[in-house]
Regions:
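DNA major-groove recognition helix of helix-turn-helix
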Residues: 29, 38, 48, 67
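Helix-turn-helix DNA-binding elements, focusing on the entry/boundary residues of the two helices
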Residues: 11, 22, 31, 46-49
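Short, charged recognition helix plus adjacent turn
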Residues: 65-102
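DNA major-groove recognition helix of helix-turn-helix/homeodomain DNA-binding modules
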Residues: 47-63
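DNA-binding alpha-helical recognition surfaces that contact promoter or target DNA
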Residues: 9, 13, 27, 36, ...
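Short alpha-helical DNA-recognition segment
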Residues: 18-36
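A short, Lys/Arg-rich alpha-helix, primarily the initiator
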Residues: 1-17
Length: 102
């Protein structure tokens, strides 16, 4: 599944579960744009993802994670979290070894 379509489905699911209509997003975007995103016709910027997440009172990563769960329905949330945790733990341990700038 294409990322645009998966992200659109994740956005629609998160929006619907919160009982929000596309029109409710008028403060952050047009209904037309939301519709295009949900159908996979457009790709939002990271800034727009953050605006949507703030409006829905969720973390922006929730929308991104939802996208990848939509894209790979055989992958469960726990295994995805474990992969992300491993990636971030590795990066954090590497950054501790780097000298700090003054």
């Amino acid at each position: 599944m294409e990322l645009n379509i998966a992200l659109g489905r994740a956005l629609r699911n998160l929006r619907s579960r919160r009982g929000l209509s596309q029109d409710a997003f008028a403060l952050v975007s047009s209904r037309t744009y939301i519709s295009q995103l949900e159908r996979g016709l457009k790709s939002p910027t990271i800034e727009k993802i953050e605006q949507f997440a703030t409006f829905m009172n969720i973390h922006p990563a929730s929308l991104i994670i939802g996208c990848y769960l939509e894209r790979s329905p055989d992958e469960d949330l726990q295994s995805l979290f474990e992969k992300v945790r491993t990636d971030l733990d590795f990066d954090l341990s590497m950054s501790k070894d780097e000298p700090t700038e003054k």
